[in-house]
Amino acid sequence: MLFYSDNNKDSYDSNHAIIFKDRIKDIQKTLEDITEFYRNKGIKPTIFQSITDNEYFESCKEIFAAHGYDVFEEENRYMVLLDDCRIVPNPLVEVRKAERWEDTFRTDIFEAAGEPWETEVAKAALEKDHTLFFVGYIEGRPVGMTYAHTKDGVCRVDYLLVATEHRKKGVGRAIIQTFAKYCMENEIENCFLWPDGESAERIYDEAGFRLVEVKKAARACYLK
């Protein structure tokens, strides 16, 4: 499975392949095809392991290396919204549910957080009907956001980002508190995520998310 965006070549979210072990016959030919596809587009190839294929990339590490890839493994800690939120939000942070894109989201959140490549991904997500998008404001200025995808009775939280200068002010907690409250009030069930680090996991735990499973995630990055 190949994802790509000619307009956002620096984003891993927009440009990556996923390999499913049971759908390929020749891993070497598959790697050659993936590498050629992305290099012809001027994109550095990144390949993700299917979450169902535990340890598959590790078992093929020498094959990946022979084709110019390095394999990295990390834990994905899956959390599900099961309990009531315990967060008391900072009253100076106002959180709103966004219905349309604003250019200040790009400058004041993504660029201010040092992640401009995620702008087009978030913008495209907001344009879809099944996306929940919440923005945190301080003194009327957007300083953080999160968004989630809802489909077929499942809600996956994709991203939580706060502008660098506004971190450690309770912005992330306020945003997640509003999001969790919205899900509970609107009976949005099966809401899950995997946190990016211990700090994020603590915030999600306070919001009522509980750790339910830990899986090994793997990706292969092209080094040439």
Q: Where in this protein do the model-derived segments appear?
A:
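Short amphipathic alpha-helix that is part of the acyltransferase structural core
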Residues: 19-22, 72-78, 82-120, 124, ...
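A structural microfeature
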Residues: 73, 142-144, 213
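Conserved acetyl-CoA-binding loop-helix of GNAT-fold acetyltransferases
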Residues: 27-35, 159-162, 168-181, 185, ...
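N-terminal charged segments
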Residues: 1-41, 56, 61, 116-117
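Conserved active-site alpha-helix within GNAT-family acetyltransferase domains
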Residues: 54-71, 173, 197-214
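Acyl-donor-binding surface of acyltransferase catalytic domains
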Residues: 27-93, 99, 217-221
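A conserved beta-strand-loop-helix scaffold within acyl/acetyltransferase catalytic domains
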Residues: 8, 115-164
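Conserved GNAT acetyl-CoA-binding A-motif
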Residues: 41-51, 183-196
